């Protein structure tokens, strides 16, 4: 049923992105505002250089067990950039990748989203939610 379906049919085009020099606090705020759990990290020419997830942000957050004051914590947090905690070697797909192959990659590598790269440039992102949306819509259309 989905053998001929490609990523480009279900991916989110022009996803919300962040630059490597952005502060972690800015990336976190952007994730909250846009209700996304991951941000592709792009260079000035829109090439993909990494990805940052809400999990990465949480791991970089100060521990409650720290002995630093709130002011020291806020200062350190404000200095931390996306580049310091992003994943650099990102698994990607192309717009023409079969959607089932993308789903298989997500399962195999235990990741919930894949940046879509076309000609070295970020073209979109495909996530678990996109796959679920495809399944639900196909079920509705076959009733």
PLM regions and their residue ranges:
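Tandem CBS (Bateman) regulatory domains
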Residues: 1-14, 54-90, 103-107, 127-143
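Residue-level recognition of oxygen-bearing side chains
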Residues: 6, 23, 98, 121, ...
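Short, flexible active-site loop motifs that bind/organize anionic cofactors or intermediates
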Residues: 14-17, 47, 92, 121-122
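The conserved cystathionine-beta-synthase
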Residues: 18-35, 41-43, 83-86, 92-110, ...
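Short, functional N-terminal and low-complexity linear motifs
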Residues: 25-29, 49-53, 67-73, 98-101
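A glycine-centered beta-loop-beta connector
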Residues: 31, 39-55, 106, 114-130
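Short, charged/polar low-complexity linear motifs in solvent-exposed/disordered segments
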Residues: 36-37, 43-45, 66-69, 111-112, ...
